[in-house]
């Protein structure tokens, strides 16, 4: 975990010994579970640090004031939500994962790492986005899922409070995708405030799309399960 500590420190992020130990245990549990549940194609220990942990922690440089409530959509193996929880133990984090086996891993790793104030919701994002307990309740919404930005914002912006931020880690060739999503972002109450480079040694250039919520999301969104992916707002 030396590289994790070194790069996080260079970004101005502080990790103590307990947090480093939590990341080490996270890596070990991820690799063990991945032998029976398809959680990630990345199994090399160093790549877990660079492509999962550091890529997740980079979000903390772009969320403005430290949030109190964060929701991670399509959390999978917990990225970026759980590394951000480890970084800021005071965060209240909700992880949304519709696949039962992945949600079971999330419940397991939350217990193993003794993380408090973490809720795992086994449901589709479209359903969660219409639930008054979650709708427009979060300071930060994250989504690292492999989907078009126009689809991701329909999952995420309904959950974001006005003034909050939606953070979408993406690959390098993102300009056209941002342009295609401009109508969806505006209709859902968002405004792009940055497309930031994410530079991690040994990893191809990635980007982080930063969207601020400037207006309420209309009641018609998100649409029914499956529709945002099949027919994005374009």
Swiss-Prot record:
It is found in: Cytoplasm. It holds the Pfam family GidB. Disulfide bonds: none annotated. This is Ribosomal RNA small subunit methyltransferase G. Keywords: Cytoplasm, Methyltransferase, rRNA processing, S-adenosyl-L-methionine, Transferase. S-adenosyl-L-methionine binds at residues 74, 79, 125-126, 144. One of its GO terms (molecular function) is rRNA (guanine-N7-)-methyltransferase activity. Specifically methylates the N7 position of a guanine in 16S rRNA. Belongs to the methyltransferase superfamily. RNA methyltransferase RsmG family. It comes from the Bacteria. The gene is rsmG. Its main location: cytoplasm. SUPFAM superfamilies: S-adenosyl-L-methionine-dependent methyltransferases. GO terms for cellular component: cytosol. Its EC number is 2.1.1.-. Transmembrane segments: none annotated.
């Amino acid at each position: 975990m030396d590289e994790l500590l070194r790069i996080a420190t260079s970004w101005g992020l502080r990790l103590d010994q307990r947090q480093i130990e939590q990341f080490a245990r996270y890596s070990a549990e991820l690799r063990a579970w991945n032998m029976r549940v398809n959680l990630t194609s990345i199994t090399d220990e160093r790549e877990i640090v660079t492509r999962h942990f550091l890529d997740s922690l980079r979000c903390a440089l772009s969320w403005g004031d430290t949030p109190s409530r964060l929701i991670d959509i399509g959390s999978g193996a917990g990225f970026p939500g759980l590394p951000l929880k480890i970084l800021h133990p005071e965060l209240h984090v909700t992880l949304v994962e519709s696949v039962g086996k992945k949600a079971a891993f999330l419940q397991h790793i939350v217990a193993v790492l003794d993380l408090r104030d973490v809720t795992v919701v086994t449901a589709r994002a479209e359903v969660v986005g219409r639930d008054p307990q979650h709708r427009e309740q979060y300071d930060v919404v994250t989504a690292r899922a492999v989907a078009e930005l126009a689809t991701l914002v329909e999952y995420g912006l309904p959950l974001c409070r006005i003034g909050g931020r939606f953070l979408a880690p993406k690959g390098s060739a993102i300009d056209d995708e941002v342009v295609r999503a401009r109508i969806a972002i505006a209709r859902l109450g968002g405004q792009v405030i940055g497309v930031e480079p994410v530079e991690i040694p040994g990893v191809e250039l990635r980007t982080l799309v930063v969207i601020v919520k400037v207006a309420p999301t209309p009641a018609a969104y998100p649409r029914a399960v499956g529709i945002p992916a099949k027919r994005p707002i374009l």
